Design a protein with these regions (language model features):
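A glycine-rich phosphate/pyrophosphate-binding beta-strand-loop-alpha-helix module
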Residues: 38
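Nucleotide/phosphate-binding catalytic cleft detector across ATP-hydrolyzing
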Residues: 1-27, 41-153
C-alpha cells in the first residue's frame, strides 16, 4: 500500500479475520455500502484493494436519479430478461454485480499470478449464492468464525 495511505478499519478487520480463517493469497469481498475487494498475500500482509459502489447504493441511485424508477430491494431474479421495471432493475444490478465480482476477482488473480481464495461478507452477501463458482466462502453469521469449526471444510 502506498506510504501515507489510509485503509478503512472495516477493511483491515475483514482481511485480518479472513487471513485467520483461510490463510493468505486471499481476496475478501465485502458487500456493504461500497463493494470492496481486499487482497492479502501469502504472508498475511495487506496488499491493497478495489472499491466499487455497493449493491444497495446502486439500486438507490437508480431510484433517486430516475423519477420513474421505484425503490427496489436486491434479490436474485427468476430470469435475466425482466418483464417489468422491478424485475429489470433487480436483474441489472444482481447479474451486473455477479459480473463485477467475477471480473475483478479474475483480474486480481491474474495480477497476483497465483491461485487466490475468495471469501465474501456483508449485508447483501446471502443474496449472491449464484456466485459460488467465484466466491468460496460466504461469511454470513458471527458463528461462522467459531474456533471449533474448521473453516476449510
Amino acid at each position: 500500500v502506498d506510504p501515507g495511505t489510509q485503509v478503512g478499519p472495516d477493511r483491515l478487520v475483514n482481511t485480518v479475520a479472513g487471513f485467520d480463517l483461510h490463510g493468505g493469497d486471499l481476496i475478501v469481498v465485502d458487500f456493504g455500502t461500497a463493494t470492496t475487494f481486499d487482497v492479502v498475500d501469502h504472508d498475511g500482509a495487506y496488499v491493497g484493494g478495489v472499491i466499487a459502489p455497493g449493491v444497495n447504493l446502486s439500486l438507490e441511485a437508480l431510484h433517486q436519479a430516475a423519477a420513474a424508477l421505484p425503490h427496489v430491494d436486491i434479490s436474485k431474479p427468476q430470469r435475466v430478461v425482466g418483464t417489468n421495471t422491478v424485475a429489470c432493475m433487480q436483474s441489472g444490478v444482481f447479474w451486473g454485480y455477479m459480473g463485477l465480482v467475477r471480473e475483478i476477482c479474475a483480474r486480481i488473480t491474474a495480477e497476483r499470478d497465483r491461485p487466490m481464495t475468495i471469501v465474501a461478507t456483508g449485508g447483501p452477501c446471502p443474496a449472491v449464492p449464484a456466485g459460488r463458482d467465484v466466491v468460496r466462502r460466504l461469511a454470513r453469521r458471527p458463528d461462522d468464525a467459531r474456533p471449533d469449526r474448521d473453516p476449510r471444510t
